[in-house]
Amino acid sequence: MEKRIGTVSILISDTSIVPEVNRILSDFGAMIIARQGVPMHQHGFNIITLIIEGTTDELSSLTGKLGRLQGVEVKSMLAKTRRQEIKN
């Protein structure tokens, strides 16, 4: 299966689940190119954004595991351009 570049946005409203989110992200570390976390304490949640490179199956597995956690919302997007079409 072809790898594609994409993004994942994670909104965490229950901070007690953060260790589990970090464990899942660590399990998928090979596909994570960049990660940015922003605490939004004044709004009562935290946001993590990821830039990833992986197959659609890998992305589905990652977002599925995160999305099943109480207090976590996940949205993802993959570029239409496939990896071999990207010029170096």
Say what each PLM segment does.
Residues M1-N88:
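Long, contiguous binding/interaction regions
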